[in-house]
Amino acid sequence: MSISIRPDEISSIIQQQIEQYDQEVKVANVGTVLQVGDGIARIYGLEKAMAGELLEFEDGTIGIAQNLEEDNVGAVLMGEGLEIQEGSSVTATGRIAQIPVGEALIGRVVDALGRPIDGKGDIKSSESRLIESPAPGIIARRSVHEPMQTGITAIDSMIPIGRGQRELIIGDRQTGKTAIAIDTIINQKEEDVICVYVAIGQKASTVANVVQTLQEKGAMDYTIVVAASASEPATLQYLAPYTGATIAEYFMYKGKATLVIYDDLSKQAQAYRQMSLLLRRPPGREAYPGDVFYIHSRLLERAAKLSDELGKGSMTALPIIETQAGDVSAYIPTNVISITDGQIFLSSDLFNAGIRPAVNPGISVSRVGSAAQTKAMKKVAGKIKLELAQFDDLQAFAQFASDLDKATQDQLARGQRLRELLKQPQNSPLSVYEQVAILYAGINGYLDDVPVDKVTSFTQGLREYLKTGKTQYAEGVRTSKALGDAEEAALKEALTEYKKTFKAAA
């Protein structure tokens, strides 16, 4: 029996099959791991990878394409990558690193990728920003003109900082660099400033102590902590400062004032050096790669005071650099000094002599901050830096001279009292009116007959007296930010009256 084949049936069956076929064809840029180790992977086959593109490995680890070479791609891993092995497949995602941003981050501790690490649950944020974004241009900025009060008398008087400024805090280890940064954050309590503290390559216990201090002082209500501790991959330690800048940038473009602390950029440079050497990039001075200046300049240039048209927001950056035996002429310190608008130099000799904060006024400078200093502070602080510098010179000279004339002795005595005046305990920032009153007393001779060891108790008592007794002066300076005739008269009266009670009690 012959089977008759009807062409129309065949064509309808084929038609049906074609209509039912719905499998999508996806084109993916996939490569193969040639070599992996030390947080670095070499990948073959990713011909279309972009510089800085995120790559996804078989085990879910994310990497960043860094070296685009002729026959392979060098990528850095953002995780342990323990299950990645030779022959594993890698997919290019077509995306560049970005993090969630928004109000939900305030009060939280996150890692370098914006993921919460404080055990308080997920961060619900609908917005995200690229970790690397261009700095504001010339037209987008305006000059620094508003003060960023640190609450530390020595800094606010001699090395003032303005909103939108980049001021380097530099010194040897254990000289109080982080303490200055934390005090500055605590002092922003009433100022409507969003603070971002970036901990790079530090011990996890140190970061926990900082967070605890901020919580105790009520500062976590307006602070975000970004932490890439010493145990994390070098890639995350390198990315953490950019993450901090991105979070602050979100608020800056919303018209808010922000403060970012990078603690510290020496460790970021070391992490970048480690990555670069493992990627076989040619080393330069101190084995750092040739573009180590650029990693810091592109980060710190993102700090700015925005123009009125862009909402008047600002990002103030306080990068920290650790020196070895006070050597500020090393590679990374000189790089960052040249990028920033001034530096606060902390001396281990002053610190060990009990002068804390151990600010060395001779080589500390603020290039733009004086324009932002309040009128009241400008009036009293003008002479103090010069007097302290002269005191340091005279003190060195007095060690060799046996008989000094009265004028020199008086200058030495006043210098000692000014030195005492600027001492300040940790985590106790002062308001502007308190700083102005203390400095006014010092430079106008009110302390000349107070014994040096009693200066601290005199200033503490004076602050209490101004809070409770003579409120006219405090309110005047608070509202006008200037030391007018009325405020000065009230301050003189308060100083004279307080001095009588202090002497009577002594």
UniProtKB/Swiss-Prot annotation:
ATP binds at residues 171-178. The record marks 364 as: Required for activity. Coiled coil: none annotated. The keyword DNA-binding does not apply. It is found in: Cellular thylakoid membrane. PROSITE patterns: ATPASE_ALPHA_BETA. InterPro entries: ATP_synth_asu-like_sf, ATP_synth_asu_C, ATP_synth_asu_C_sf, ATP_synth_F1_a_nt-bd_dom, ATP_synth_F1_asu, ATPase_a/bsu_AS, ATPase_F1/V1/A1_a/bsu_N, ATPase_F1/V1/A1_a/bsu_N_sf. The keyword Lyase does not apply. Keywords: ATP synthesis, ATP-binding, CF(1), Hydrogen ion transport, Ion transport, Membrane, Nucleotide-binding, Thylakoid, Translocase, Transport. Produces ATP from ADP in the presence of a proton gradient across the membrane. The alpha chain is a regulatory subunit. NCBIfam families: atpA (TIGR00962), PRK13343.1 (NF009884). This is ATP synthase subunit alpha. It comes from Nostoc punctiforme (strain ATCC 29133 / PCC 73102). The lineage of its organism: Bacteria, Bacillati, Cyanobacteriota, Cyanophyceae, Nostocales.
